[in-house]
Amino acid sequence: LADELKVSRTTISNAFNRPDQLSADLRERVLATAKRLGYPGPDPVARSLRTRKAGAVGLVMAEPLTYFFNDPAARDFVAGVAQSCEELGQGLLLVAVGASRRLDDGTAAVLGAGVDGFVVYSVCEDDPYLQVVLQRGLPVVVVDQPKGLAGVSRVGIDDRAAMRALADYVLGLGHREIGLLTMRLGRELRQGLVDADRLRSPAFDVQRERIIGVWEAMAAAGVDPDSLTVVESYEHLPESGGTAAKAALEANPRITALMCTADILALSAMDYLRAHGIYVPGQMTVTGFDGVPDAIGRGLTTVAQPSLQKGRRAGELLLKPPRSGLPVVEVLATELIRGRTAGPPA
């Protein structure tokens, strides 16, 4: 193309990448000739090798890729990251390294990701892929967990305080027999009733903080925290909450309130209760956490967290870090939503 037009290769590059460096007539001539010759423009791979910039952000999540299409809160979060990337002229690469993926394959995916930095979404501190991300030596922002990772910025919420406020509300209605349906507490495949040992040492900070929030509220209300019935769900499936609700009620038929650490669990639990003739809230109080549109539409009592904003801020912190160069922790506000699914015990 340069030979055809009798110009330098720099001129060709400027026509595609820095049009302000050329006159409008010259750039139009370059583009028209390129189209006639079938030349699509500079090779992006070659350009990234030369500039050492990939022009993309890697979003690492220890979940199957389908999780971000099935879970509404996670979907909003990804949309937020995508918005910040789009506004700042960057691409977004999803790196899904869920439990079903072989460790070697997942490691290769992280090592081979052509990105300028990573947003790591809600993993435990000993997650093997987190260590691989850190070994890349690229900028990193963590979302939700792990907390307190040295030298790394984080965006999240105060999970303990948010869950404490919700539990205070439930206990204030008079409930004393409470079941708590949680997302997975560790990386290993386990679900069902949670024993005391596992309950005291969850690998995931978010679930641990939400459990502690309920315990603190129970203790303040004079209720033994050890009386809390906890059921763990490993997978995020439409029926997960219903399965967990069944297990909780079988373990303790005296339960009058089911608190859930995610709206997706609460909505599924409500479906199970309705199918079994248990009226909400007349016979059972149900609460969630996230504030997703489906939950709000069904009147769920829940905690709303700004998932979209969380994604946006994570992307912005990665792409436009503080001038100080020091890591920051941003704690976003939550809101207790008093819906139609909580009432006094029957």
Range-by-range predicted roles:
Residues 1-53, 346:
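N-terminal helix-turn-helix DNA-binding module of bacterial transcription factors
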Residues 19, 51, 102, 127, ...:
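Generic structural signal for helix capping and beta-alpha/helix-loop junctions
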Residues 43-45, 103-108, 126-128, 243-247, ...:
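A generic local structural motif
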Residues 2, 120, 259-261:
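Short beta-strand scaffold positions
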Residues 36-37, 83-87, 134-142, 146-346:
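Bacterial carbohydrate/catabolite-sensing allosteric modules
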Residues 11, 56-59, 64-168, 172:
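Alpha-helical recognition/docking segments in bacterial nutrient-uptake
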Residues 8, 55, 116, 175-177, ...:
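Short acidic/polar active-site loop segments enriched in Thr and Asp
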Residues 51-55, 112, 240-243:
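A short, glycine/Asx- and small/polar-enriched loop/turn
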